C-alpha cells in the first residue's frame, strides 16, 4: 500500500475553501499567523454586508490586496475545518509542508505540534483520510523570506521531486543507497535546504562518486540542532586516501556554480577522503560548520599503523571569487583549508586540529593556477603538521599574490610553523625549487605559537620567483634548523 502525507504547517487548519490566488498567498497567510485578531474580525465581517474597506485592520487589508472578496474568502478559510478528499500521490517517501512562510535568511527551529493528514489508498481504490497530531520541525518567528512551499523529505527517492518543486526542503533522516547522490543541483532560486536527524550513505567504491552535490543562486543550506551528516568513512579508510588503495569517493560534499548563497551550521563527520570541494562559486559564505573526522586518527587493519583517514582536507577551494569561510571547526588529517585558485577569499575564525594547517596550494598543473587576494585571519591551528603554508608544484607555472595571514595562533606544530616551498610534489618535496609559479605580496602579521618539533620557519623559493614578503609581529618558537632562502635577510 502506498501512502504519503500532507503537513499543513499553520494552525488552525485551512481546508476546503476558496483560498485567494494560491495556498501561499499573503492574505491567507496573515489570517493564519494572526488567527486571534482575524477570528475577531471575521466574526462580524461578511462580503454581503461590508462592501467597503473602511475600518478593516490594516494588516489584513494590505495583505489581501485591499479587496473585500479576498477578505471574505480568507475568513471562510479560517472558519472551515472540513477535510477534502486527497488524491494519492505516486511517491511514498515524501512529506509535503504547505506554508506561507518564506525562504529563510536565518534559521531558528523549534518543535511544535502540527496536524498531519495521512492519505492511504485502500485495495478498493477508495481514498481514506485521517488526521492525527505529530511533532514536526517548524520555523519560529525568525523564519523569514520570500514565501513558497516547504517539503519534508524522509526517503531518498523523494529528493529529486522536492528539489524541483519546493522552495524550502527539510531532509530528515535520509539514507542514500549505494551510488546514490544527494543531488541538490536543481534548487529553485532562493531555496533553503535544511538537514535534520542523521544523514547516512551506503558503500560506493568509486573515486568519481560525489555523495552530496549542490548548486544554485541565493540558496541557503543549513541544519537543525542535533543533526549529523555521516560520510561512512570507516568503510573506505585504508591509510592511503586518494593516493592509492581501494576506490573511494574523492570529494564528499561538492559545491559548484553557487552564487550569492550560504552554507551554515552543518555537522559533518567521517567523510571518506576530501570533505568540501568549493568550485566556481561567487559571493558564497560558509559559516558555523563542524567537520569532525577524529575517528580517522586511529589506525585500522588496512593502514599499516598510520591514521586510517588520509587526504581528508576540510575545504578545497578553487576557481571561486568573493568567498568567505568563517567560524568553523575542523578536525582532520590533511589541509584544514587549501586554496588552489580564486580571488578575494576570506578565511576567518577557524579552529583547525590535527591536519596540515591553512594552505595556499598546491599551485600549478591545473586548469586555473592563479590565486589573488586571500586572507587567513583570527584562527587557531592546533596539533597539526603545519601552521601557515604556501606550496607550489615543482616544474609548473602559475601566480600567487596578495596573501595575508593575520592573528594566527599555532600550538603543537610538528613540521613547519610558516612554510613556503616551491618544490612540492604529492609524493614528497624534491628539495630543488622551481620558479614557474611566482609568489608576491605575502604578509604575515601576528602569527605566533609553538612547535613540538620541526622548523619554526621554512622558505624555499626558486630563483627570483618570490617578492615582497612582510613579517610583522611574527614569533614562533620551539623548533630548530630554520631555513629561509628568501628574503635575503633570512628567517623572521
From Swiss-Prot:
Pfam families: Glyco_hydro_28. It comes from Aspergillus oryzae (strain ATCC 42149 / RIB 40) (Yellow koji mold). Residues 1-16 form the signal peptide. The lineage of its organism: Eukaryota, Fungi, Dikarya, Ascomycota, Pezizomycotina. Transmembrane segments: none annotated. Its main location: secreted. GO terms for cellular component: extracellular region. The gene is pgaD. The active site is at residues 334, 356. Its EC number is 3.2.1.15. It is found in: Secreted. PbH1 repeats lie at residues 216-238, 258-280, 281-319, 320-341, 371-392, 400-422, 434-478. Disulfide bonds join 151-166, 336-352, 461-466, 484-491. One of its GO terms (biological process) is pectin catabolic process. This is Probable endopolygalacturonase D. GO terms for molecular function: polygalacturonase activity. Belongs to the glycosyl hydrolase 28 family. It is an enzyme of class 3 (hydrolase).
